[in-house]
């Protein structure tokens, strides 16, 4: 079994068709770990925005991604995630991200671009943040913590200026996960996403 830790960087856009705000994915990064938790492959891709062509100042300040960089190296969402699904070899892996907010954004983008929230290649998912937090003894209220804070607690060296780029965040998340991985303890955190989990994630009564 492989593990794929992915991270998304998104831009705040306004979906005029739905008359609501939307977090539009601009970059995806991922690392693949084998059963010995060795990084065996990486994935990184910029995505051409369709909902809003303008990158917000906050997005540019946080990621240091420029409009020219996106224009020169970006590809459409559908193509990017076809490539990602092919790269992941999804049948035998558990997907992870740092908190399920990435999962929520991914489902929202799938719903916008394909009219259905289900992410077909993602069968199993685990929240790496939630799993790692169980090992923090000084967090009695179980408050969510940032990736950088968790790395600090686990005594993992992090270059702050490299954070908030998708692939770099994946390297840090992988290092945190490797510090505390135990197959028996991790197993209950794996969710089956083969049904209507994504639709339920986005359901608003």
What does each model-found stretch correspond to?
Residues 23-28, 32-63, 86-205:
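Metal-dependent phosphoesterase core characteristic of DEDDh/y 3'-5' exonuclease domains
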Residues 1-4:
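Extreme N-terminal starter segment of soluble prokaryotic enzymes
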Residues 61-84:
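Metal-dependent phosphoesterase signature
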Residues 19, 70-73, 140, 163:
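Alpha-helix initiation/capping motif
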Residues 8-18:
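Short acidic, Gly/Ser-rich segments with clustered Asp/Glu that frequently serve as metal-coordination loops
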């Amino acid at each position: 079994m492989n593990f794929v830790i992915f991270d998304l960087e998104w831009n705040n856009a306004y979906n005029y068709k739905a008359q609501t705000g939307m977090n539009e994915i601009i970059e995806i990064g991922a690392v693949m770990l084998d059963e010995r938790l060795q990084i065996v492959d990486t994935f990184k891709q910029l995505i051409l925005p369709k909902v809003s062509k303008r990158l917000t100042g906050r997005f540019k300040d946080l990621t240091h991604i420029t409009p020219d960089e996106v224009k020169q190296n970006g590809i459409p969402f559908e193509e990017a995630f076809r490539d990602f699904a092919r790269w992941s070899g999804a049948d035998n892996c558990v997907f992870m991200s740092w908190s399920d907010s990435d999962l929520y954004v991914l489902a929202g983008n799938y719903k916008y671009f394909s009219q259905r929230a289900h992410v077909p290649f993602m069968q199993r998912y685990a929240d790496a943040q939630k799993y790692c937090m169980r090992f923090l003894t000084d967090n009695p209220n179980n408050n969510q913590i940032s990736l950088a804070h968790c790395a600090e607690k686990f005594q993992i060296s992090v270059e702050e200026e490299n954070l908030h780029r998708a692939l770099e965040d994946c390297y840090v998340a992988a290092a945190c996960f490797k510090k505390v991985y135990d197959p028996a303890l991790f197993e209950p955190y794996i969710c089956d996403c083969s049904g209507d989990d994504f639709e339920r994630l986005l359901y608003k009564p």
